[in-house]
């Protein structure tokens, strides 16, 4: 799936609360939405945008789940993980 910018996506209330709880800034989220390194379809209408980021002293993978079957697109949730190899697609 080709990378496309989703910077106009609305951040759901759930996603905003998860960002606050997980220490993910709006700037980091917007960066992934604007220019994701990878885009994967979970199911029709929902995609995952992900990018690697240096957070503190650690390399992390930021994963953003977006519903694209609504207009504008809506960020459902976002999290970061150190398990880059588990989720990174080499395709």
How would you label these PLM feature ranges?
Residues 1-91:
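Ribonuclease/tRNase effector modules and their secretory precursors
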